């Protein structure tokens, strides 16, 4: 019986990973199409019908190119960091709330925080092991940025833990049957979305990949497979952050088709931000993290703690 359950959960995990990777492929196509229409041009439209097979052609091109590595780089860490980056981006999907018994995490929120904290190391090691000044600067920027915004991210998640009384993601579904958290906590949703942009190194917070300053940033020395893996990890984390936003703020009804429409819309917002917003200034980025978001999330945390104490004192 145990073996049967184990095999079923293994098949479920494999299906989840395959679906995430296919979603990543089509998210890149969506991004290129949307950016094309924002810049008043058509996106990829030559390959197949309306350019739909384009991501698969890109994948074939990237993985069949010659794999080069810099002579002065640290060979092992240079190769392992993109693989570990993609592994973490796929591993964090385990805390997606399932109704069926695939994984039922009582500490899903904590698991998510652990995985995002580990994601810092991959960028740092990728930047350092390339042995290039540009890559190192990009890596250091990414580390400073991610650590700064992770504090506010953890505090906001902790506020929700106090509110719903559990780290389990399924509790978000029970508490949002009648009203979404987005409606009653709109400022918090905006801050969470901004932090998600910073955590995934997206515009306007793409300092790790500042082309105008750092010649592509921490992944400047990566070609073919290594670059593709970093790219896939970034887009998998964008999809995950979109999914998490839907779970926390937009009603966590995973079996409803509308949940995936909402997820697609939030992913579209990430792309929309890239097409419309210019890059932020680095000092303003740090001021935003430590002076605005930290005080905001701390105030909300104290408010929720006070609210629960008040509630229990009257019960």
UniProtKB/Swiss-Prot annotation:
Coiled coil: none
Disulfide bond entries: none
Keywords: Electron transport, Membrane, Mitochondrion, Mitochondrion inner membrane, NAD, Respiratory chain, Translocase, Transmembrane, Transmembrane helix, Transport, Ubiquinone
Subcellular location(s) per record: Mitochondrion inner membrane
GO BP field: aerobic respiration
Record flagged with keyword Transcription regulation: no
Molecular function terms, GO-annotated: NADH dehydrogenase (ubiquinone) activity
PROSITE patterns, per database record: COMPLEX1_ND1_1, COMPLEX1_ND1_2
E.C. designation(s): 7.1.1.2
Swiss-Prot/TrEMBL catalytic activity: a ubiquinone + NADH + 5 H(+)(in) = a ubiquinol + NAD(+) + 4 H(+)(out)
Residues that span the membrane, as ranges: 6-26, 80-100, 107-127, 153-173, 177-197, 229-249, 253-273, 292-312
Record keyword Membrane present: yes
Reported function: Core subunit of the mitochondrial membrane respiratory chain NADH dehydrogenase (Complex I) that is believed to belong to the minimal assembly required for catalysis. Complex I functions in the transfer of electrons from NADH to the respiratory chain. The immediate electron acceptor for the enzyme is believed to be ubiquinone.
Homology family: Belongs to the complex I subunit 1 family.
Name recorded for this polypeptide: NADH-ubiquinone oxidoreductase chain 1
Taxonomic source organism: Drosophila persimilis (Fruit fly)
């Amino acid at each position: 019986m145990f073996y049967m359950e184990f095999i079923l959960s293994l098949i479920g995990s494999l299906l989840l990973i395959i679906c995430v990777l296919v979603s990543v492929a089509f998210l890149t196509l969506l991004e290129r199409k949307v950016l094309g229409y924002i810049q008043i041009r058509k996106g990829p439209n030559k390959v197949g019908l309306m350019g739909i097979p384009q991501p698969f052609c890109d994948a074939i091109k990237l993985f069949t190119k010659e794999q080069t590595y810099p002579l002065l780089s640290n060979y092992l860490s240079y190769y392992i960091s993109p693989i570990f980056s993609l592994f973490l981006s796929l591993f964090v999907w385990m805390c997606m709330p399932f109704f069926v018994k695939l994984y039922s995490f009582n500490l899903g929120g904590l698991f998510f925080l652990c995985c995002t904290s580990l994601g810092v190391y991959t960028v740092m090691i990728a930047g350092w092991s390339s042995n290039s000044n540009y890559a190192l600067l990009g890596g250091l920027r990414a580390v400073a940025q991610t650590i700064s915004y992770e504090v506010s991210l953890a505090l906001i998640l902790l506020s929700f833990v106090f509110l719903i009384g559990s780290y389990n993601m399924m509790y978000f579904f029970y508490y949002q049957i009648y009203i979404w958290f987005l409606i009653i906590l709109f400022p918090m949703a905006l801050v969470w979305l901004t932090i998600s942009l910073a955590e995934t190194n997206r515009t306007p917070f793409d300092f790790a990949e500042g082309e105008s300053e750092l010649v592509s940033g921490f992944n400047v020395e990566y070609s073919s497979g290594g670059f593709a893996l970093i790219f896939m990890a970034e887009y998998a984390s964008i999809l995950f952050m979109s999914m998490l936003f839907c779970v926390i703020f937009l009603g966590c009804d995973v079996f409803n088709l509308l949940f995936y429409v909402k997820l697609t819309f939030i992913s579209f917002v990430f792309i929309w931000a890239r097409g419309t917003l210019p890059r932020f200034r680095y000092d303003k980025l740090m001021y935003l993290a430590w002076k605005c978001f930290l005080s905001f999330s701390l105030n909300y945390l104290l408010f929720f703690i006070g609210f629960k104490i008040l509630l229990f004192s009257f019960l």
